[in-house]
């Protein structure tokens, strides 16, 4: 009888993240949405908890620890920070906080975040489906690059203006820098 425990395989893009955790998650949401939003006279970005804007117009969320497994067997890559977009005198309000990249044992990848869409209370939901596109970055600080599309639940985040499957901006997970030898 074989009593050897089979450990679940880890997608290749996660290997650099396991020892020390993700460095940060960068995502622009959707460029056309940002263009529309920034034309509104009362638009405001409120970034806190470590979230920051990037030179390209996207947003960076810092890592908050090494990936873990949840009760369903998903790898959870956690990030921190809060982004709130408001305009139209408060009628437009989008919250994206403490994003998590979820990786299934079969390799499916999605993005969840705390949003303000369930009966006016913050709740976590999957907002984007991610597809691994390859690696980049520097040798001591590799990156995993993803294309993104709007998830079924994510369409509610944008008040029905975009639909499940619509393309979103690409996403990048950057690992913590490896120590120099």
What are these regions (language model features)?
Residues 57-118:
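Predominantly extracellular/secreted and cell-surface proteins with exposed
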């Amino acid at each position: 009888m074989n009593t050897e425990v089979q450990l679940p395989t880890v997608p290749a893009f996660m290997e650099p993240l396991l020892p020390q955790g993700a460095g940060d998650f960068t995502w622009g949401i959707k460029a056309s949405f940002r263009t529309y939003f920034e034309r509104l006279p009362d638009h405001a970005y409120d970034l806190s908890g470590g979230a920051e804007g990037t030179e390209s117009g996207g947003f960076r969320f810092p890592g908050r620890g090494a990936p873990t497994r949840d009760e369903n067997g998903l790898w959870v890559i956690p990030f921190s920070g809060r982004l709130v977009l408001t305009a139209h005198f408060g009628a437009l309000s989008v919250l994206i906080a403490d994003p998590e990249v979820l990786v299934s044992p079969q390799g499916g990848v999605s993005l969840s975040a705390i949003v303000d869409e369930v009966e006016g209370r913050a709740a976590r939901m999957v907002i984007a489906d991610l597809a691994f596109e390859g690696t980049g970055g520097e040798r001591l600080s590799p990156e995993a690059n993803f294309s993104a599309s709007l998830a079924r639940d994510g369409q509610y985040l944008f008040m029905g203006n975009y639909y499940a499957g619509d393309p979103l901006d690409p996403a990048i997970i950057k690992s913590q820098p490896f120590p120099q030898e």
